[in-house]
Design a protein with these regions (language model features):
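Ampiphathic alpha-helical segments that act as solvent-exposed interaction surfaces
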Residues: 84-116, 183-225
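Short aromatic-glycine-(Arg/Gly/Cys) micro-motifs in beta-strand/loop hairpins
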Residues: 58-84, 160-186, 215
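Generic low-complexity, intrinsically disordered sequence content enriched
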Residues: 41-44, 59, 133, 137, ...
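Intrinsically disordered, low-complexity segments enriched in Gly and acidic/Ser/Thr residues
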Residues: 139-198
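Short, mixed-charge low-complexity intrinsically disordered segments
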Residues: 50-58, 155-161, 216-218
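Long, low-complexity, intrinsically disordered segments
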Residues: 223-235
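Negatively charged, low-complexity tracts enriched in Asp/Glu with abundant Ser/Thr
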Residues: 1-49, 103-159
Length: 235
């Protein structure tokens, strides 16, 4: 796919920000990074009122490991007033960005990766876990994340904290390993009682990642409003 096919089309010609605050936030969160943003998914509603994007911030590789590589963006236009508002969130995993958009009524068929972009799931376990994250992201907020670049593999670790205080094993560690030779990625989940236990396992890794206990994995929460991102570069 030519690089031009990844260019996000914001469709804001003839529109003005709905307020000074919207103008400042759009400039600081989106416009100043526009040259570094590649669209992995974008969808515009037929009535022209809404647009949805999953954007890859290519400049994140030069930042801190905690910088979020993906930006989920929802633009809402008022054609009568010729103004727009927006929401955006920096997120570490594609499935979490999908979840954020789906809960803002983006069609599920519109959040798949653009052909030729990104990597493919390495196995059925990865596919199932990504589907669960898309559908039930409101179980957790993001406590921390980091991404490490390298070759032939790259790794992203995300620590999630359960939003239900009574939830068993409230901390979940997501570990995504990308193989740049095969252009595939593997995603695994570990369940922990505390954040310290999750981070200790991540540092040591001498034992298998602890799986969620059956009682926790059988819970079927309502669909999310999208995961809450960890602190990092503001989006």
């Amino acid at each position: 796919m030519p690089s031009s096919d990844y260019e996000p089309v914001f469709c804001l010609e003839g529109y003005q920000p709905a307020s000074v605050q919207v103008a400042d936030q759009f400039r600081d969160r989106i416009a100043v990074y526009e040259a570094d943003l590649n669209a992995l998914a974008q969808h515009h509603t037929p009535d022209g009122r809404q647009s949805f994007f999953i954007l890859h911030d290519t400049s994140a590789v030069f930042g801190l490991p905690i910088d979020m590589p993906l930006v989920a963006l929802h633009i809402t236009r008022d054609p009568e007033a010729r103004t727009f508002t927006f929401e955006s969130e920096g997120l570490p995993l594609y499935a979490l960005a999908q979840s954020w958009l789906l809960q803002r009524h983006c069609p599920a068929s519109a959040v798949g990766r653009a052909e030729g972009s990104g990597t493919d799931p390495a196995d059925e376990t990865t596919i199932a876990l990504e589907q669960r994250l898309r559908d039930h992201g409101n179980q957790f907020s993001i406590a921390m994340s980091y991404s490490g670049d390298g070759y032939p593999t790259q790794e992203t670790a995300v620590l999630l904290k359960g939003t239900d205080r009574g939830q068993p094993q409230p901390y979940r560690l997501l570990l995504e390993t990308t193989d740049l030779r095969t252009f595939t990625h593997q995603l695994r989940e570990g369940a922990f009682d505390t954040a310290d236990a999750a981070l200790a396992w991540l540092e040591d890794r001498s034992t298998p990642m602890p799986k969620p206990r059956p009682a926790a994995s059988q819970q079927l929460p309502v669909k999310p409003a999208g995961p809450v991102a960890a602190p990092g570069r503001a989006r």
